[in-house]
Amino acid sequence: LAPRAFNHTWELLDAEELTREQEEEMLASSFAQRHHWYQVGTPRNWAIADWQVSRVAAVLGYSDLALRFGERSLEVSLEHGLDAFVRGFAHEAIARAAASVDDVETFTEHLELARAALAEIDDDEDRDVLATDLADMSER
């Protein structure tokens, strides 16, 4: 269930436009994947699950929720010594949440920490995924 809910949430995130019902479905699906990953996954899965909830919340305009789960993703990443890719995306989530409420200081701090994580990511594809998201945020 965890991977299916995670992938379904991504499909909705990638949609050009969402109806109100689809937005609600996306939010519910993000929480479903998180719940299931916390039952069957590893700390890496947990951090990524929290990141996805944060991303969905940010997209839907729930900045407090986005910040809460971005911070949770970072806590799990640090507590379990997770890799730079996961840690970088946790910082990205916090920066994205901060941007939505015009918290320039927090946005800048976590954007820079996410950028710093790029240098520690060995896999080119993973590094490019994070770099693309960070570039997108910088252009806003």
Regions found by a protein language model. Name each.
Residues R20-A32, S63-E71, H110:
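Helix-turn-helix repeat elements of alpha-solenoid scaffolds
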Residues E71, E75, A98-D122:
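TPR/TPR-like (Sel1-like) alpha-helical repeat modules
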Residues A5, T9-L12, S29-S30, W46, ...:
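TPR repeat positional signature
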Residues N7, Q52, V86, A93, ...:
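"A position-specific structural signal for the A-helix of alpha-solenoid helical repeats
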Residues H8, A32, Q39, R72, ...:
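The canonical alpha-helical register within tetratricopeptide repeats
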Residues Y38-T42, V76-D83, A119-E125:
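Short coil/turn linkers that connect adjacent helices within long alpha-helical scaffolds
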Residues P3-R4, E23-E24, R44, F85, ...:
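Residue signature of alpha-solenoid helical repeat architecture, marking inter-repeat boundaries
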